[in-house]
């Protein structure tokens, strides 16, 4: 089979970013793509236009991301302007566009490995131009493309089923939590409230609960406090000099299954002086970006004011509160103003109305929840593994195709 360098069989157009004064969002000029940010599965989404384009790609040219990240591809949906993060590739008459596109998707990881740079990885035009591509006869290219797309179609159908299963598991999880906190999973025991507590009368819009239970604001059930990170800018390197105090962020809370033990940053003494070290076992509740994500500190750690720490009093189990907050995610999201980054304030959490029952019944509620959700978690893990295998299978199909094994 003949093999040629890309520059010998394709027209290659390096992107160049026009001056920003020519950018607009009202459709003046050509659609403008700077890099991968707008990429979809096959075609990018148009968000920005350029009235004075410098480098142009034609409809169905292959758009290759050449910097941060290197390798992803899309097709130009029409005549477009391309910025420095992209290179356009226009196959000659000896190549099918879909064949070249699929070749790049097969070669993506290897191409990414050729990236250089410290701040972000990028590849030069020489790397693109000298990339070698096998060129079988056009009928064979058509056969390869048709076979890949047939197998991808079958794989996509399986992936769609897996995603539906995952969505159904999320619905089931919320249904379990709803039943648990409406008292439908336990035998009820009357509980008396301390005189200092105020049972909430604002229950008209809340679900009915057993008469032995009470609706209580979360502020009566423990101490709530926002994390601290007073210094600006928050990423100032001097905060992390000689770092030894774990610094937890909202992403770390979301990524934790139950207990936070991993982190990417550590405060030094200066960082600690403008923050607060929370003890191991604190329940972390996110209130910005990722709202109502929860996890327990598995270590002493600092965190910013986008996370609230909760320490229960003797009348409530922290795990009970954690599951209840999880059940209220949609409701808490509704309290967030319509801004670029969703967030709620501490007052919203303090006044979150909790269905309160005795400690013994809380233990049973937790047990009933966990016995059901453990099955759910096991199935979800199986689904996630299958989704990862599907992506690996996609690469295996491409590998087989371009090694002549299909």
Label each region the model flagged.
Residues 1-16, 130, 134-145, 200-230, ...:
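Non-catalytic DNA-recognition/assembly elements of restriction-modification systems
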Residues 7-22, 29-59, 201-204, 219-238, ...:
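Sequence-specific dsDNA recognition surfaces
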Residues 38, 128, 181, 185, ...:
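Hydrophobic pocket-lining residues within nucleotide cofactor-binding pockets
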Residues 60, 97-100, 129, 148, ...:
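Alpha-helical structural signal
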Residues 150-206, 381-406:
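Short amphipathic coiled-coil heptad-repeat segments
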Residues 34-36, 44-108, 122-124, 249-250, ...:
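A short beta-sheet element
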